[in-house]
Regions:
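Short loop-to-alpha-helix "cap/lid" segments that border enzyme active sites
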Residues: 3, 14-108, 112-132
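Active-site beta->alpha loop and helix N-cap motifs at the rims of alpha/beta catalytic domains
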Residues: 1-8
């Protein structure tokens, strides 16, 4: 990290956030949400850290195309969260009408087949967010 000038570190594993404080960079820490996940607000309170919540499934840590139960967002500081997991043009307004995340992350929700982004789906997704 001393050789590149990064603004943000995005962590996807089981690493401890505090181990990365020495780099003095903002952090986005991915948390994988399962049907049994519970988040306590104090667990999401780290200086210069945002959290990306993504759906965990039996076989995948993200990329499943499935939404997690957004009700878990009711008791956490959503404005610090990046929301991922099953987002697509058909449900993005439903999310935004209930919660105000810092950012949304879309991947498979704008694909017409696995690994192939669809320009029309991408435009539809972005247009809906902008219009909202």
């Amino acid at each position: 990290l001393s050789k590149v000038d990064l603004d943000v570190l995005q962590l996807h594993g089981t690493e401890d956030i505090t181990d990365y404080r020495i780099f003095k960079k903002d952090i986005i820490k991915t948390l994988h949400v399962s049907k049994d996940s519970v988040f306590i607000s104090k667990n999401l309170d780290f200086e210069n850290t945002d959290f990306l919540l993504d759906t965990s499934s039996e076989n995948l840590q993200g990329g499943s195309g499935q939404c997690f139960d957004w009700k878990i967002l009711n008791d956490v500081p959503v404005e610090k969260l990046f929301i991922a997991g099953g987002l697509k043009p058909d449900n993005i307004i439903d999310l935004l009408s209930k919660y105000t995340p810092k950012c949304v992350d879309v991947s498979s929700g704008i694909e017409n087949k696995i690994g192939h982004k669809d320009h029309n789906l991408m435009s539809d997704f972005v247009d809906k967010i902008r219009a909202y």
